[in-house]
Structure formats: C-alpha cells, structure tokens
Amino acid sequence: MLKDVVISRAIVESYFKDLLNNLELDVAIVGAGPSGMVAGYYLAKGGAKVAIFEKKLSIGGGIWGGGMGFNKIVVQEEAKEILDEFDIRYEEFEKGYYVADAIEVATTIASKTVKAGVKIFNMVEVEDLVVKDDRVSGIVINWTPVKMTGLHVDPLTVEAKYVIDSTGHGAQVTQFLLKRGLIEKIPGEGAMWAEMGEKLTVENTKEVFPGLYVTGMAANAVSGAPRMGPIFGGMFLSGRKAAMEILQKLGL
C-alpha cells in the first residue's frame, strides 16, 4: 500500500540532502542554459564540486526554440567536437555549418551534465552575491515564487570559490556588482552579427571580477559585443573555456 506521507518524506529528505551537500562548492553556476551546462559538465569531469542554479522551472535556456520556434540549431566547425563529446547527432548543411535537433541538444546536454556529477537546482533564483575582501565568494539564493510574488523572505547563502554568470542577455549576476559600484558599467549586447558575436563570445569569456566569470551571452553583454541568434557553437566553447580556466586555478 502506498502511503502519501512516505512519498512526501522521500522527496523532502532527498532534496534537502542534496541542498546541504551543495552549500559549499568549488563553483556555483547561475543559469542552466547552454554555456552554463557545458561549463558544469567540464568542471565536474575535471573533479570540481559544482552546482547550477536556475530560476525557471525548465532548464536549457534558449536552445528549445531553435530559430523563431523552428527547433533546429546551427553549430559551426570549431564547436562540432563538443557535439561529438556529448554524442549529439547532426547533419552538415553546407561546409562548416552543422544542424542539430534542438530538443536532442537540450535533453542530451542536460542529462550528461547531471550524470557527470552536476546538481541542478531549478526554481531557485540568485538574488545577490557574497563579496568578501573584494572577491566574489558565493551566491545568495531564494525560491523563484518568493521573488515573483514580492514576499519579504530572507534568502540563504551558498559559498563558492568561483561563480559563473551564465544568465544570458541580461548578465543578471554581474548586474549585482554594477549596482554596488564594484564595476563601472555593463554596456549590453550589440545588434545581430553572427560571425563576430560567435567569435567574441569566446574571447569575452573571462573573470570580470575576482571570483566571477561570465559565459555565453552574459559575456557579450558585459563587453558590449554583438548577439548571434540560433547558432550555438560559441555558447558551447564559452562554457568549456570558463571551465578549463577555473579548473586550472583550482589546481584540478
């Protein structure tokens, strides 16, 4: 006989076990989009303790809708090896242009990221950063519904040696530093230019403040670089670059 209270206990106890186990991290990633999940995957494979915090119910960022709701994405030659790493199928459309199914990309990256050892907490919003001695050293979290309803509920803190802002176009985590005058400006993303946007996404993936990295569209927003639309190679390469740099700094 099934008991309702046992079901409840199983969920509550297992969830809070995960939460307690992830209050002290090597890396806290904010945003479970393509660059965030790829960063998490490579970090976990490299031996880092990492969790991703996503304010939405679903993960995957902008992958699902492809271009204008046509659920296909394009990846360029330079990033094809990451599709191979995740065992994602693709077809060559023209030389240097590879098309993949957006649903397969989102679900496969998510699955392999979790299986690599990354814990993803969805419906958890990061509302601030922990900054000590001029260095980002953690995140401040609350339930997304609490933020949506405007209830005055104090948050909790997660400590991390590094934080990655993978929140996309708004660079929402880096905005906390701007708000407090710890960085001078965030110019925002430029107009659409796929070639330059893809190139600069990787170049702009860096530590913008001690302890804080930016990836994906957050990297371009912080640097004022162009957007690129439904081509995702830059997102994947950006996540991998951040992961590799952080692993080196962690000595892993």
UniProtKB/Swiss-Prot annotation:
One of its GO terms (molecular function) is iron ion binding. Glycine binds at residue 227. Pathway: Cofactor biosynthesis; thiamine diphosphate biosynthesis. The keyword DNA damage does not apply. NAD(+) binds at residues 35, 54-55, 62, 126, 152-154, 217. One of its GO terms (biological process) is thiamine biosynthetic process. InterPro entries: FAD/NAD-bd_sf, Thi4_fam, Thi4_prok. Its EC number is 2.4.2.59. Gene3D superfamilies: FAD/NAD(P)-binding domain. Fe cation binds at residues 154, 169. It comes from the Archaea. It catalyses: hydrogen sulfide + glycine + NAD(+) = ADP-5-ethyl-4-methylthiazole-2-carboxylate + nicotinamide + 3 H2O + H(+). Its cofactor is Fe(2+). Keywords: Iron, Metal-binding, NAD, Thiamine biosynthesis, Transferase. Belongs to the THI4 family. Homooctamer; tetramer of dimers. Involved in the biosynthesis of the thiazole moiety of thiamine. Catalyzes the conversion of NAD and glycine to adenosine diphosphate 5-(2-hydroxyethyl)-4-methylthiazole-2-carboxylate (ADT), an adenylated thiazole intermediate, using free sulfide as a source of sulfur. This is Thiamine thiazole synthase. It comes from Pyrococcus furiosus (strain ATCC 43587 / DSM 3638 / JCM 8422 / Vc1).
